[in-house]
């Protein structure tokens, strides 16, 4: 009965238009399928499941199924030529044509790719398409759905329209290869029809190169679904080209296809799905520690569940799509948000699926582990291949926190463990916050794979940990006592560690060269960056202490703030902005991140570390110099400017724009009523990343004037754009959302 109801619901969708997601929003990024330049696309898959990407030129690549695979140059995005979409068209009176749906065959002017993640669309409306086709791609990346966000599945909803005056036969085929396979099987369950490309062997998988794929669709009285396997793609094309159907035969092949076929009357539109799912239960680090992927908690670990996953997708995709559509439209329909923000918020979410994301469901190689804990982490970038990087996730965790807060809390607990723990399945605590929780070689098994600098004496990490703990506790209702209890001892140790870094007795941590997230930038003495973060953390720690009933300690934190804050003012305030530091070669330099602590406290509903008047003056100084005089305000905010309005070129990082810290500046501006300035910064970054720089789906950490020397593609920090959303939500009442 459930399937009958869902089938009727889906059938009537063509008339009622319940699939609002089939309408491409104006905020979606778009590009001709045949356009020259960098090619990539929105991924499918789930957290920790590995991902598959259908690029904007119509090519598929599968390399990220091996979690952690990637490099700075993007060479891993090479296409698998056995994985393709095809379209068959035949008029009632006339010959059939078959199009391979990629740029090499179509060229320009035939199709347009669009993305507003988690949706992507391709609209085939050129002269080669008498039957017009539009496909909507998505995975169930549903906020606060901690089950389906793990699923290794993608949905391709094909909408075919016959605008001609005669009947047309139309068919869509997806060909695929299982790089780990040995044979194929036909599978059917009522109207659900599919092909499984089986894993090699019959035993339970023990390697990340053991698993299977499923291609499936939905048959009906008017829709015929066929499938087959073959020795090569050419054989599948030949069979499909004959009549738009496949032979329903399988053998010992690793390549196969599924196709649906329908006859369209003049003016008729239909919507038919193709599902792509996989089951590769194990992932492993370079040092061969193995982990079960999170989705296996909801199926099993046998590596034979791709058909079960596909069936669930066929049954529930209408519900998934509705929930995703409501999420997207709460953003796109919000009149408080500028248009650039609507696009950036969603499209920058790709990083959680393409950045080597682990989400484990237990150790698979005998290592000590709590299988119910579900550790989660992703890379800082491919060139800096550290997991979790705490100083960066301070900015780059806002999207995760705002959509899946329980996952973010687990990430923070891992860093709390780096300070203090008495667990047998963790490395010993360091007495200070770790930079990371391992690299691609040894994720989850060590602290501080980063050795470029000695991060154990950095001046920002401990303050950032306390602020993230407070954020995740306070902004989720201040009710999660288990989370606070788990992190509290580490917070106290972290606060004392920073207090010991005050060398001159003014209550502020003293920098001694390179000792914070800007790890090629010398800072000396009191600094607006680290000092401001410490002031912010004192106010957060006070609130945590009060929640724990430690009133004397709360008073201590307040007293430390009251003592240090006037020194922050007297040492760093120039009358217009806060100096970068007190002891470098030029303390009067203008650092864009000087009010990072102010922004965070405003975001958390805490008192500011400086007056609003001083904050506004400082942000205006940053806007006038670090933004407006950096490429004439065309591509973000440069890290450091000289007081005379020239770019500070004393280090590589002073003369860079960092995308993520630029978002922190914009968020701080919004919190202080400077929306016009934030809007200019945001628009410049949208244009840079998704237009002139061609950085789509690989947003870098940094670039220099005129977009020279981009660095660290696929970078973690850029999802700080969600902090800008949080800022708008804080200063404007939320509008009432009514589903269409």
Walk through the language-model features, giving the residues of each.
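Bacterial N-terminal signal peptides that target proteins for export
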Residues: 1-5
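Bacterial N-terminal signal peptides
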Residues: 7-16
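Beta-strand-rich N-terminal accessory domains
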Residues: 21-91
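Acidic/polar, glycine-enriched structural segments that form the non-catalytic walls/loops
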Residues: 21-27, 31-32, 40, 126-129, ...
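Non-catalytic C-terminal accessory modules of carbohydrate-active enzymes
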Residues: 59-61, 68-72, 79-86, 91-138, ...
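Aromatic-rich carbohydrate-recognition surfaces in CAZymes
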Residues: 86-96, 162, 295-317, 374, ...
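Extended glycan-interaction surfaces of carbohydrate-active proteins
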Residues: 334-382, 419-456, 501-525, 565-659, ...
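Active-site core of glycosidic bond-cleaving carbohydrate-active enzymes
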Residues: 389-420, 462-464, 471, 475, ...
């Amino acid at each position: 009965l459930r399937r009958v109801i869902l089938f009727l619901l889906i059938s009537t969708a063509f008339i009622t238009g319940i699939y609002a997601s089939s309408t491409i929003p104006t905020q979606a990024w778009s590009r001709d399928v045949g356009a020259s330049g960098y090619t990539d696309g929105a991924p499918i898959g789930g957290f920790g499941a590995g991902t598959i990407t259908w690029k904007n030129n119509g090519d598929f690549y599968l390399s990220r199924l091996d979690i952690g695979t990637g490099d700075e140059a993007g060479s891993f995005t090479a296409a698998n030529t056995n994985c393709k979409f095809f379209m068959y068209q035949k008029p009632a009176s006339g010959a059939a044509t078959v199009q391979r749906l990629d740029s090499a065959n179509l060229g320009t002017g035939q199709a347009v790719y669009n993305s507003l993640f988690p949706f992507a669309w391709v609209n085939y409306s050129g002269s080669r398409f008498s039957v017009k086709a539009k496909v909507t791609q998505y995975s169930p990346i549903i906020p606060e759905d901690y089950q389906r966000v793990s699923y290794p599945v993608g949905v391709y909803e094909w909408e075919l329209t016959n605008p001609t005056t005669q009947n047309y036969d139309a068919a869509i085929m997806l060909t695929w290869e299982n790089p780990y396979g040995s044979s194929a099987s036909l599978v059917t369950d009522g109207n659900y029809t599919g092909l499984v490309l089986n894993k090699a062997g019959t035993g339970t998988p023990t390697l990340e190169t053991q698993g299977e794929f499923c291609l499936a669709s939905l048959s009906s009285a008017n829709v015929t679904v066929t499938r087959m396997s073959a020795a090569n793609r050419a054989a599948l094309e030949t069979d499909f080209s004959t009549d738009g159907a496949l032979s329903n035969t399988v053998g010992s092949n690793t390549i196969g296809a599924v196709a649906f076929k329908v006859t369209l009357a003049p003016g008729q539109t239909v919507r038919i799905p193709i599902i792509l799912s996989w089951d590769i239960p194990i992932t492993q680090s370079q040092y061969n520690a193995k982990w079960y992927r999170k989705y296996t908690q909801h199926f099993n670990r046998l590596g034979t569940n791709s058909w079960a996953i596909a069936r669930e997708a066929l049954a529930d995709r209408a519900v998934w799509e509705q929930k995703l559509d409501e999420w997207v439209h709460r953003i796109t329909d919000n009149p408080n948000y500028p248009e650039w923000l609507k696009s950036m918020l969603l499209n920058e979410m790709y990083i959680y699926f393409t950045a080597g994301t682990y989400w484990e469901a237990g150790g698979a190689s005998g290592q000590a582990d709590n299988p119910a804990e579900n550790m989660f982490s992703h890379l800082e970038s491919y060139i800096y291949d550290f997991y979790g990087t705490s100083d960066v996730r301070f900015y780059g965790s806002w999207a995760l926190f705002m959509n899946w807060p329980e996952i973010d809390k687990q990430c923070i607990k891992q860093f709390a463990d780096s300070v203090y723990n008495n667990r047998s399945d963790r490395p010993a605590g360091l007495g200070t916050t770790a930079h990371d929780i391992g690299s691609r070689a040894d994720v989850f098994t060590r602290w501080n794979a980063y050795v470029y600098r000695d991060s154990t004496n950095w001046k920002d990490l401990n303050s950032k940990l306390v602020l993230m703990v407070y954020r995740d506790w306070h902004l989720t209702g201040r009710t999660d006592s288990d989370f606070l209890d788990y992190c509290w001892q580490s917070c106290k140790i972290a606060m004392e560690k920073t207090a010991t870094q005050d060398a001159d007795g003014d209550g502020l941590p003293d920098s001694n060269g390179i000792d914070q997230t800007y790890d090629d930038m010398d800072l000396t003495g009191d600094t607006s960056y680290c000092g401001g973060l410490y002031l912010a953390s004192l106010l957060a720690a006070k609130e945590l202490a009060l929640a724990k009933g430690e009133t004397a300690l709360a008073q201590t934190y307040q007293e430390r703030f009251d003592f240090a804050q006037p020194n922050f003012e007297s040492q760093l305030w120039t009358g217009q902005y806060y100096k970068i530091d007190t002891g470098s070669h030029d303390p009067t330099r203008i650092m864009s991140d000087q009010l990072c602590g102010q922004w965070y406290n405003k975001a958390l509903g805490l008192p500011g570390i400086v007056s609003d008047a001083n904050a506004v003056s400082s942000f205006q100084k940053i806007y006038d110099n670090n933004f407006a005089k950096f490429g004439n305000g065309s591509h973000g905010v440069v890290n450091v400017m000289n007081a005379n309005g020239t770019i500070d070129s004393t280090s590589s990082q002073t003369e860079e724009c960092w995308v993520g810290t630029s978002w922190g500046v914009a968020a701080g501006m919004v919190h202080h009523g400077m929306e016009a300035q934030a809007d200019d910064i945001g628009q410049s970054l949208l244009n840079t990343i998704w237009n002139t720089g061609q950085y789509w789906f690989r947003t870098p950490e940094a670039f220099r004037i005129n977009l020279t020397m981009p660095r660290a593609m696929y970078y973690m920090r850029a999802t700080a754009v969600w902090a800008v959303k949080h800022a708008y939500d804080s200063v404007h009442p939320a509008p009432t959302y009514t589903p269409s």
